[in-house]
A protein has these predicted regions:
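Alpha-helical scaffolding within the catalytic cores
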Residues: 73, 98-105, 157-162
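Solvent-exposed loop/turn segments at secondary-structure junctions
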Residues: 5-8, 56-60, 91-96, 122-125, ...
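N-terminal catalytic or cofactor-binding beta/alpha core of small enzyme domains
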Residues: 1-84, 93-99, 191, 201-206
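Loop/turn elements at helix/coil->beta-strand transitions in domains of secreted/extracellular proteins
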Residues: 45-49, 81-85, 113-114, 151-152, ...
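Structural recognition of the beta-strand scaffold that forms the well-ordered cores
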Residues: 1-2, 50-52, 85-88, 116-119, ...
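Active-site-adjacent substrate-binding region
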Residues: 130-157
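A short, glycine/acidic-enriched catalytic loop
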Residues: 17-23, 94-130
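Active-site-adjacent mobile loop/cap segments within catalytic or ligand-binding domains
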Residues: 153-206
Length: 206
């Protein structure tokens, strides 16, 4: 799923889109939802059963997007009690003084964006059980990817906020690239991530 589904990338080549806002578009051919399509296909190939929620939760209002996506997670858990892992796929935003930066993983074939895993904790004082278990899941995925592609992953980030991760025992936020990356760089990165992390995630849900 995508709490901020309109997150998009730097237009390049044929990937030109009508922007809804700065580096945002509701066109799912060009925003993070398209990257999610690639991840869903890659994880399915790793023999994981995948339900890809392509709903745009951050338009027309960005405010309240986590409340809306959280309500959707609850509905999915009621409908599919065996649901084990919920991935909220985003792209990062790295900028300073109006300069937009990109993340780069130098690979033998071609450069792509980097990927970051984000894990919420209970540091805010809000209810968030099993966050350490989610950290272990992130570490397992991170180790699997770094073994295959040492430069693909950014360090795991721990944050005080829950970002709806308290709703399941297997939640992950994945940030693919940043607003300075192109869509092609992001899709290349998420495919490599899924190919390497997919088997590790599959073992966790068995």
């Amino acid at each position: 799923m995508h709490t901020h589904a309109s997150e998009a990338f730097t237009p390049a080549g044929r990937d030109l889109y009508p922007a809804s806002d700065t580096c945002r578009t509701e066109d799912t051919n060009y925003n993070i939802v398209h990257v999610g399509d690639v991840l869903a296909d890659t994880l399915t190939a790793a023999r994981l059963q995948v339900l890809h929620d392509r709903t745009i939760y951050d338009y027309p209002s960005y405010t309240g997007s986590y409340n809306r996506s959280g309500a959707a997670v609850q509905e999915y858990l009621n409908q599919y009690p065996s649901l084990r892992i919920v991935i909220d796929l985003h792209r990062d935003a790295l900028c300073s003084d109006s300069v937009v930066y990109k993340t780069v993983a130098e690979l033998p074939d071609a450069a792509c964006s980097q990927v970051m895993l984000l894990v919420g904790t209970n540091a805010s004082g809000l209810y968030h059980p099993y966050w350490e278990e989610k950290l272990r899941t992130a570490v397992s995925a991170q180790d699997a990817v770094k073994t295959a592609h040492p430069t693909l992953m950014r360090p795991i980030t721990l944050v005080n906020e829950r970002y709806n991760q308290h709703l399941t025992r297997g939640s992950l936020i994945i940030e693919v690239g940043s607003s300075g990356n192109t869509l092609q760089e992001a899709t290349r990165a998420v495919r490599l991530f899924g190919e390497s992390a997919g088997p590790a995630l599959a073992r966790l849900v068995q």
